[in-house]
Amino acid sequence: MNIFEMLRIDERLRLKIYKDTEGYYTIGIGHLLTKSPSLNAAKSELDKAIGRNCNGVITKDEAEKLFNQDVDAAVRGILRNAKLKPVYDSLDAVRRCALINMVFQMGETGVAGFTNSLRMLQQKRWDEAAVNLAKSIWYNQTPNRAKRVITTFRTGTWDAYKNL
């Protein structure tokens, strides 16, 4: 298991524009196109991102390219963020993937707002961090994914992603 496999489970591949859990137009493996309510705006963003007229549909290869760019952007966001980088640096490889997963979903600014949980993670207080993360709006909005990510933080294993 790695971050790419983890996110493929949590995001799934969709080759046609869809609305995510927050109602935002998305495509591929969790690639946010726009927060605009306009489907035409989403199609325009997609055409720019891919470099051709897509009419709201992309190939698997195009989805993979966007996905790789998005994972790279999430990691870069963590490394440049003064609140996230020290936490990331303190984590083992599996737990780093859990943090990348959160940033992929919510953005670096969103995750940086988890001040208490981040402090607990940096201090390796896994059980307390898990309890705290489960009290979040994020947990209520995407409970299945949040449970898997939280279990990954708590255990430092891929157990939550086995057999999925």
Swiss-Prot record:
Protein's name according to its UniProt entry: Endolysin
Protein's job: Endolysin with lysozyme activity that degrades host peptidoglycans and participates with the holin and spanin proteins in the sequential events which lead to the programmed host cell lysis releasing the mature viral particles. Once the holin has permeabilized the host cell membrane, the endolysin can reach the periplasm and break down the peptidoglycan layer.
pH note: Optimum pH is 7.3.
Reactions catalysed, as given in the entry: Hydrolysis of (1->4)-beta-linkages between N-acetylmuramic acid and N-acetyl-D-glucosamine residues in a peptidoglycan and between N-acetyl-D-glucosamine residues in chitodextrins
Annotated residues for binding of substrate: 32, 104, 117, 132
Organism annotation: Enterobacteria phage T4 (Bacteriophage T4)
Compartments it resides in: Host cytoplasm
InterPro entries: Endolysin_T4_type, Glyco_hydro_24, Lysozyme-like_dom_sf, Lysozyme_dom_sf, Phage_lysozyme-like, T4-type_lysozyme
Catalytic residue list: 11, 20
